[in-house]
Amino acid sequence: MEYVVVIPAAGQGKRMKAGKNKLFISLKGAPVIIHTLRVFESHAPCQKIILVINESEREDFRQLLAQFPIQTEIELVTGGAERQHSVYEGLKMIDKESVVLVHDGARPFVTHQHIDKLVETAEEAGAAVLAVPVKDTIKRAEGSRVAETFDRSSLWAVQTPQAFRLSLLKTAHMEAENKGFLGTDDASLVERLDGYQVSIVEGSYTNIKLTTPDDLIFAEAIMKAESGNHNV
């Protein structure tokens, strides 16, 4: 059940309109990235955290980790031009065959229970993603007009972490690089390989990614609810 997690943290998060890396935004007394790191710090099967960063922010991350120490081993790695390239740089730092998780730095509410199920599924199937059934009707548009309505019953909103056997994910990234393919997530790279399928593990609607200012309101509400549950 042991695993290594790669967390791409080099994005600027322009939709957050914070004027800085959104992972540095304070949430209930600590930066968003610290809340995310604490999830893995408190999960015994996590052997190492690879934090992929923008080189210009290396000192910022060092200072942050000095102020908010994390006991699990963390390696800071310089990322690439796109998220996909950053993840690949992180994967290069892992030598021992294992299950590797790829997780958004701005997704601090994933639970240990879901991580355990995800790792277990990846060990068996090779690749697995957390996802939740889509609640809303999804339509494809052309300009400002509806072009198609999809059957919602078969649609899932994919989250992170996503879990893979290390060798499989490395192969998928190498293949994507060789063919110049840029995917929307790591699972999409594996889906392109012959003979491999990605399993779905049902997650939670509270495992939100903090992308826009409104998400911070939802995050505070989730934290308040979690705090209330702990006090019961």
Curated annotation (Swiss-Prot):
Pfam families: IspD. It catalyses: 2-C-methyl-D-erythritol 4-phosphate + CTP + H(+) = 4-CDP-2-C-methyl-D-erythritol + diphosphate. Keywords: Isoprene biosynthesis, Nucleotidyltransferase, Transferase. It comes from the Bacteria. PROSITE patterns: ISPD (PS01295). Catalyzes the formation of 4-diphosphocytidyl-2-C-methyl-D-erythritol from CTP and 2-C-methyl-D-erythritol 4-phosphate (MEP). Belongs to the IspD/TarI cytidylyltransferase family. IspD subfamily. PANTHER family: 2-C-METHYL-D-ERYTHRITOL 4-PHOSPHATE CYTIDYLYLTRANSFERASE, CHLOROPLASTIC. This is 2-C-methyl-D-erythritol 4-phosphate cytidylyltransferase. The gene is ispD.
